[in-house]
């Protein structure tokens, strides 16, 4: 029976999302202007942040771009922020946007090499605990020199490869043309294997995700806010590494111990092993690939290997913006592996562009946070504390809590600017400023693993094409990150409270780093 035009509009709104979800979004859109104009803009701002987090939490029901985008458009329309402020945020974060557009697409053209390497690792290491540690350590090591988003893009690319290989065989379809998002053709016997395999991949991805945070906090190139903090403090690569080490080294080792423990104890959704049937399929696939590999395929692997070397060197030496290095990877990889048709290249951009659009919406929410000064009460309260040791601990905690809610790049930037202003005005000494910069950097990087909105890499993982395939939801990510959140946050706080000041003093005595005088760079304007 045909439906009326009115019902058709309702049915089309947010498509297949549940009715209660559609009602919730419409309710948000009605409530926000009322709260903004009639009650309090500050309250309306926090309400908007909570609603946006809700859309992220429901990412498996509906991609957050549409509901989050509607909320952002309304916020701009009613004057919670301005298009100019949103543009300012996007311009300030152009490197992150370029990275998503080009680097993730560049990784797509290297997936044969990545699948080749990681298949060897996956099949070579039988112990799940050792395998988890390998993934966590590799992600941490790479994130210290590359960007965490790049590392996660690599891991996602590999995991989709592994998943689709098994799914094809389990569905009885030929390797060539197959839709790995449909489970209809899978028998009950293999369905159990599939569920176990999903749990196995989920745990590896979460270990790798936390690994990016463990490594990303240690160096000035690991996360975008690290660069901003290092720039404001006038630190170079070596000094940044040394100043962070009293906090980052204990955290790193405790993170690896946590990784091993959750696997051994099989808690928080960890501990799933690779099912034997799946292992056999991957072994058979690897053997088949080896037999059918032509010289042309070998040449492609060599080219991709050389491009991988170029990628690591270029990123470690900061030869260009990350996104531009990604563009060079696309050009080199396609030129030397013979991918020259436009439609073949288009597939590479499918994964990252929806997320790039979502991130643009995210930055418009950040613009609201800036214009409505949502974090100001917290910042003022912490700066008002007289005792230096308490101030350090509070800065770490406040940064950590706000980074769980908002983007850690934004939180780190806002805080370092406020502290820089306090230094210029003579409210704190240069020595205290350097210690606070460490507290801000570690505070934004470590506790923010608690939720996907804190870390861009986690958000990318949650909204990737892989998340629904392996049933990785917002809630599940929060639960799986919980043991890491507790350990990283507490060990980081202990480092700030007990190790940072004495260790920094001993670094000065040893001559590894020198105390800075009042030399300053100008404060970054706006939010970033």
From Swiss-Prot:
- Topological domains on the Periplasmic side lie at 47-95, 164-239, 318-320, 376-389, 501-528
Q: Which residues lie on this side of the membrane: Cytoplasmic?
A: 1-23, 119-129, 263-297, 341-352, 413-477
User: Where in or outside the cell is it found?
Assistant: Cell inner membrane
Show the stretches that span the lipid bilayer.
24-46, 96-118, 130-163, 240-262, 298-317, 321-340, 353-375, 390-412, 478-500
Listed GO CC annotations: plasma membrane
Q: What is the effect of changing residue 147 to G/M/T?
A: Loss of antiport activity, both at pH 8.5 and at pH 7.0
Q: Cite the GO molecular-function annotations of the record.
A: sodium:proton antiporter activity
Q: Where is this site: Important for antiport activity?
A: 147
Q: So what does mutating residue 147 to E actually do? A: Loss of antiport activity at pH 8.5. No change in activity at pH 7.0
Q: Which reaction does it catalyse?
A: 2 Na(+)(in) + 3 H(+)(out) = 2 Na(+)(out) + 3 H(+)(in)
Tell me what topology the record assigns in the membrane. Multi-pass membrane protein
Q: Which domain of life is it from?
A: Bacteria
This protein's UniProt keywords: Antiport, Cell inner membrane, Cell membrane, Ion transport, Membrane, Sodium, Sodium transport, Transmembrane, Transmembrane helix, Transport
Q: What PANTHER family does the annotation carry?
A: NA(+)_H(+) ANTIPORTER NHAB (PTHR43302:SF1), TRANSPORTER ARSB-RELATED (PTHR43302)
Q: Which NCBIfam families match?
A: NhaB, PRK09547.1
Say what the protein does. Na(+)/H(+) antiporter that extrudes sodium in exchange for external protons.
Fetch the HAMAP family from UniProt: NhaB
Annotated family: Belongs to the NhaB Na(+)/H(+) (TC 2.A.34) antiporter family.
What name does the UniProt record give this protein?
Answer: Na(+)/H(+) antiporter NhaB
Whose protein is this, by species? Vibrio alginolyticus
Q: What is the lineage of its organism?
A: Bacteria, Pseudomonadati, Pseudomonadota, Gammaproteobacteria, Vibrionales
């Amino acid at each position: 029976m045909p439906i009326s035009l009115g019902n058709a509009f309702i049915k089309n709104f947010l498509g297949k999302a549940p009715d209660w979800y559609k009602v919730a979004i419409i309710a948000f859109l009605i409530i926000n202007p009322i709260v903004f104009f009639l009650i309090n803009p500050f309250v309306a701002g926090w309400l908007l942040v909570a609603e946006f987090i809700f859309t992220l939490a429901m990412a498996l029901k509906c991609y957050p771009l549409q509901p989050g985008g509607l909320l952002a458009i309304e916020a701009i329309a009613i004057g919670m922020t301005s298009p100019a402020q949103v543009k300012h945020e996007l311009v300030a974060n152009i490197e992150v946007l370029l990275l998503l557009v080009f680097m993730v697409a560049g990784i797509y053209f290297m997936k044969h090499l990545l699948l080749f390497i990681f298949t060897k690792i996956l099949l070579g290491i039988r112990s799940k605990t050792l395998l988890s540690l390998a993934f966590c350590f590799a992600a941490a090591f790479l994130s210290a020199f590359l960007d965490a988003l790049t590392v996660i893009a690599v891991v996602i690319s590999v995991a989709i490869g592994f998943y689709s290989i098994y799914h094809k065989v389990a569905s009885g379809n030929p390797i060539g043309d197959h839709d790995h998002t449909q489970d209809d053709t899978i028998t009950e016997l293999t369905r159990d294997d599939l569920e176990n395999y999903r749990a196995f991949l989920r745990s590896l991805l979460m270990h790798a995700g936390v690994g990016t945070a463990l490594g990303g906090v240690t160096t000035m190139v690991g996360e975008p806010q690290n660069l901003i903090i290092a720039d404001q403090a006038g630190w170079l690569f070596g000094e940044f590494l040394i100043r962070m080490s009293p906090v980052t080294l204990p955290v790193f080792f405790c993170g690896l111990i946590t990784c091993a423990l959750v696997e051994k104890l099989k808690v928080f959704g960890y501990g799933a092993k690779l099912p034997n049937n799946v292992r056999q399929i991957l072994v058979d696939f690897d053997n088949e690939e080896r037999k059918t590999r032509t010289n042309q395929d070998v040449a492609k692997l060599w080219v991709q290997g050389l491009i991988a070397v170029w990628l690591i060197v270029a990123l470690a030496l900061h030869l260009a913006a990350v996104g531009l290095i990604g563009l060079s990877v696309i050009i080199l990889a396609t030129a030397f592996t013979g991918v020259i048709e436009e439609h073949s290249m288009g597939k590479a951009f499918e994964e990252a562009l929806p997320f790039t659009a979502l991130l643009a919406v995210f930055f418009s929410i950040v613009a609201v946070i800036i214009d409505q000064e949502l974090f100001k009460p917290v910042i003022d309260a912490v700066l008002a504390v007289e005792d230096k040791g308490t101030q350090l601990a509070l800065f770490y905690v406040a940064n950590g809590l706000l980074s769980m809610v908002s983007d850690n790049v934004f939180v780190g930037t806002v805080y370092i600017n406020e502290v820089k202003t306090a230094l210029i005005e003579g409210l704190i000494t240069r020595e205290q400023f350097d210690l606070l910069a460490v507290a801000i950097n570690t505070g934004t990087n470590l506790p923010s693993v608690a939720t996907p909105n804190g870390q861009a890499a986690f958000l990318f993982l949650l909204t990737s094409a892989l998340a629904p395939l392996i049933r990785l939801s917002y809630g599940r990510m929060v639960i799986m990150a919980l043991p890491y959140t507790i350990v990283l946050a507490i060990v980081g706080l202990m480092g700030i409270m007990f190790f940072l000041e004495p260790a920094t003093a001993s670094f000065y005595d040893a001559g590894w780093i020198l105390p800075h005088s009042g030399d300053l760079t100008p404060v970054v304007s706006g939010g970033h």
